C-alpha cells in the first residue's frame, strides 16, 4: 500500500515536471471548493460572539487548507474573479465607535459585500510612511513583478556584509536615502493623518458606491469626530499600497535602530464579530516595554495585525506570552492568518487534524507542540475523528 502510494506520487510529480497535463485533467466539480461558500453570510453576522475567521477554525480545516506542512502538495484549487470596477472611500475618525458603526452598516445593509476594508492606526501610518517608503516606491514605479528580484539582491548584499560581521547594512543605507526624500503620499491622506487617529480604507464595487456614498455622507454630516473623502483612482491605489507597505515597516525600523530596539512581537488576531471594544488597552507594565505599537488589519473581518516594537533589554517572548493571556480574556483567536508553527500550542481539533493528514507523523513533526515521535505516541488521538462537520455538509 505504501509502495503504491509512493508510485502514484512519483507519477504525479513527473507529470508536473514534464508538463504532461492539460485542461482535461482538471475536475471542475462544484463540491470541490477552494474557499468556504458560506463566508459571506458568516461575516455579515456582526452580532456573533465568535471571530469571522481564523486559521485553526475546525469548520474550515480540510485537506490542504490548514495543513501546515503535514501534506506534500502538488497543486491546490484557488478561486479567481474578474476584476471589478471599484471606488475607494477614505474614512478618518478620532472615535473608534464611528468605524464600528460604519463596519456594521456596510456589512449588513449593502446588497453586496464591500471588496475590501483595511484599518490603519495613525502610528502604523507614520511608521509605514517613513520605513515602508522604499517598498511603496518600488512597487509604485516598477510593479510587483520586480519585487522578488529586488529582495533577492538585498539578501545577497546582506549575506556578504554579515560574513564580515555587519548586520542590517542594506536596511540602514536604504533608510538613510529614504529619509532625504519628501512624502510620497497624496495630500488628502496626509491631511487626514493630521486630523484623525483611526483610518479606514473601504473599496466597494461601482454598483454599491452610491449607497455607500449616501450612508457616509449622512453619517458624517455635522459629526466632529470623523470625516471621509472619495478617492480618485491615484489616491485609492496609493492608499492601499501604503497599507501593504506598512506590513514590513516594523522590521525596517528594527534594523535602522539596533541600539534601542530589542525585537518585534508580531501578532495576528481575530476578534469576535460583535466586539465593539476593538481598540487594545495594554497595562502599564507592558506599555513601558514598547517603543511603538502598529495596529492595522482587515477591519470587516475583524482580523488585526499588531506589531510591537520592543525596547532593548525587554524579553519579547515573555511580553508575547503576557499578551496571549490578555487576548484569551477578550475571547480572541490567534494566530488568525498564520499557522501555529512551533511557537503556539495547537488546540485539540487542530492537532487531531494534523494526525489525520499524517498518521505516521513524518511531515513537520512537533508542529503546534505536538509529539515529535513517529506514530504520534499517545498524542491527539481523541480529536482525530474525520473531516470537520462543516465540510461534510458542504460536500452534500
Model-derived features: where do they sit?
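A generic local secondary-structure boundary/capping motif
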Residues: 6, 51-55, 60-65, 78-79, ...
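Flexible, low-complexity linker/loop segments at domain and module junctions
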Residues: 80-87
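Active-site loops and adjacent core secondary-structure elements that bind or stabilize anionic groups
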Residues: 10-11, 118-119, 123, 130-131
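Conserved mixed alpha/beta core segments that line enzyme active sites in large multi-domain catalysts
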Residues: 18-67, 74-76
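Single conserved hydrophobic/aromatic residue that forms the stacking wall/gate
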Residues: 1-12
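Conserved glycine-rich FAD pyrophosphate-binding loop
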Residues: 165-396
Amino acid at each position: 500500500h505504501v509502495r503504491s502510494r509512493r508510485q502514484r506520487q512519483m507519477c504525479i510529480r513527473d507529470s508536473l515536471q514534464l508538463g504532461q497535463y492539460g485542461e482535461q485533467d482538471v475536475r471542475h466539480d462544484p463540491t470541490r471548493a477552494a474557499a468556504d461558500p458560506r463566508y459571506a453570510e458568516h461575516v455579515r453576522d456582526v452580532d456573533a460572539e465568535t471571530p469571522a475567521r481564523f486559521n485553526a477554525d475546525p469548520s474550515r480545516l480540510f485537506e490542504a487548507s490548514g495543513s501546515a506542512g503535514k501534506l506534500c502538495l502538488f497543486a491546490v484549487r484557488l478561486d479567481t474573479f474578474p476584476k471589478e470596477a471599484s471606488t475607494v472611500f477614505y474614512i478618518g475618525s478620532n472615535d473608534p465607535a464611528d468605524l464600528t458603526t460604519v463596519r456594521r452598516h456596510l456589512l449588513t445593509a449593502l446588497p453586496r459585500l464591500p471588496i475590501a476594508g483595511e484599518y490603519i492606526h495613525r502610528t502604523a501610518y507614520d511608521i509605514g510612511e517613513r520605513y515602508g517608503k522604499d517598498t511603496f516606491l518600488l512597487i509604485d514605479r516598477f510593479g510587483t513583478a520586480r519585487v522578488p528580484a529586488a529582495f533577492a539582491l538585498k539578501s545577497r548584499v546582506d549575506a556578504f556584509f554579515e560574513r564580515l560581521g555587519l548586520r542590517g547594512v542594506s536596511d540602514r543605507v536604504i533608510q538613510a536615502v529614504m529619509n532625504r526624500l519628501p512624502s510620497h503620499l497624496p495630500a488628502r491622506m496626509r491631511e487626514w493623518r493630521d486630523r484623525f487617529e483611526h483610518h479606514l480604507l473601504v473599496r466597494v464595487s461601482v454598483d454599491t458606491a452610491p449607497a455607500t456614498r449616501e450612508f457616509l455622507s449622512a453619517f458624517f454630516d455635522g459629526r466632529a469626530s470623523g470625516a471621509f473623502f472619495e478617492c480618485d483612482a491615484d489616491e485609492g491605489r496609493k492608499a492601499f499600497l501604503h497599507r501593504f507597505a506598512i506590513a514590513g515597516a516594523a522590521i525596517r525600523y528594527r534594523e535602522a535602530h539596533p541600539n534601542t530596539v530589542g525585537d518585534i512581537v508580531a501578532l495576528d488576531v481575530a476578534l469576535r464579530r460583535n466586539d465593539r471594544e476593538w481598540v487594545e488597552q495594554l497595562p502599564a507594565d507592558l506599555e513601558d516595554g514598547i517603543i511603538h505599537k502598529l495596529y492595522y488589519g482587515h477591519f470587516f473581518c475583524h482580523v488585526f495585525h499588531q506589531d510591537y516594537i520592543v525596547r532593548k533589554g525587554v524579553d519579547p517572548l515573555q511580553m508575547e506570552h503576557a499578551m496571549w493571556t490578555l487576548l484569551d480574556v477578550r475571547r480572541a483567536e490567534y494566530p488568525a492568518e498564520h499557522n501555529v508553527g512551533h511557537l503556539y500550542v495547537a488546540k485539540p481539533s487542530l492537532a487531531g487534524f494534523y494526525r489525520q493528514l499524517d498518521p505516521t507523523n513524518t511531515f513537520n513533526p512537533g508542529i503546534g507542540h505536538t509529539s515529535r515521535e513517529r506514530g504520534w505516541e499517545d498524542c491527539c488521538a481523541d480529536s482525530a475523528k474525520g473531516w470537520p462537520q462543516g465540510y461534510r455538509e458542504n460536500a452534500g
